């Protein structure tokens, strides 16, 4: 929850990761693999860096050998100072990493159900995701976030649109928090289950 975050700790983390130099942070949490759309995200970021030098990407998760990213993408992640890759992060700290993000991006090709999107929405982050199985049910389009295709140019354009409009980001973020509260909090899910069996 956003209200649980200690701002002093958040600022310390921001400085430690080198994100204090940037005014806009694109966030991702999950495995750093092809299936999650990381190739498209890094390619989109290359496009965005030509427009602005105050944007960063925060990748929270592990590089994996299964479904591994191509070497040129890995090298870009490892050498671009505006791409921060954290590796594994303890669950108890994850909300602080969401707290550093301005938007959350999941350009995935397939998901069971993207809990990372729900976590990000509960932290009042606007979402950019695809219409892949699972992802399609995780947002309300143009209310809590935006859908994109598996295309770096379209992804860059959508991120730039949100970067330029703080009011829309704020609106989507607040609506996303309500969407999660009303549909995915534990007591709501238990009520739905009870209705099925009573």
Feature names for model-found ranges:
Residues 3-19, 73:
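A short helix/loop element that forms part of the nucleotide-sugar donor recognition site in Leloir-type
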Residues 20-36, 42-45:
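Conserved donor-binding/catalytic core segment of Leloir-type glycosyltransferases
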Residues 70-89:
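Nucleotide-activated donor-binding/catalytic signature segment of Leloir-type glycosyltransferases, i.e.
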Residues 88-89, 96-101:
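Short alpha-helical donor nucleotide-sugar binding micro-motif in glycosyltransferases
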Residues 109:
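Aromatic "clamp/platform" in nucleotide-sugar-dependent glycosyltransferases that forms part
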Residues 126-129:
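Short hydrophobic beta-strand element within catalytic cores of glycosyltransferases
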Residues 141-142, 146-153, 161-167:
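Conserved acidic donor-binding segment of nucleotide-sugar-dependent glycosyltransferases
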Residues 154, 161, 168-182, 189-195:
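A short, well-ordered alpha-helix in the C-terminal region of glycosyltransferases
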């Amino acid at each position: 929850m956003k209200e649980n975050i200690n701002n002093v700790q958040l600022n310390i983390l921001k400085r430690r990761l080198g994100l204090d130099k940037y005014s806009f942070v694109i966030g991702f949490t999950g495995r750093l693999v092809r299936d999650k759309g990381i190739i498209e995200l890094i390619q989109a970021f290359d496009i965005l860096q030509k427009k602005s030098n105050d944007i960063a990407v925060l990748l929270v998760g592990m590089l994996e050998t299964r479904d591994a990213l191509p070497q040129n993408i890995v090298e870009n992640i490892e050498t671009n100072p505006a791409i921060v890759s954290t590796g594994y992060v303890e669950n108890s700290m994850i909300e602080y990493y969401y707290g550093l993000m301005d938007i959350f991006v999941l350009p995935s090709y397939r998901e069971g159900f993207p809990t990372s999107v729900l976590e990000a929405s509960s932290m009042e982050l606007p979402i950019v995701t695809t219409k892949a199985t699972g992802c399609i049910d995780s947002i309300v389009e143009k209310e809590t976030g935006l859908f994109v295709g598996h295309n770096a140019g379209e992804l860059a354009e959508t991120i730039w649109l949100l970067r330029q409009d703080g009011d829309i980001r704020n609106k989507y973020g607040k609506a996303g928090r309500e969407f999660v509260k009303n549909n995915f909090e534990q007591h709501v899910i238990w009520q739905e289950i009870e209705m099925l069996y009573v």
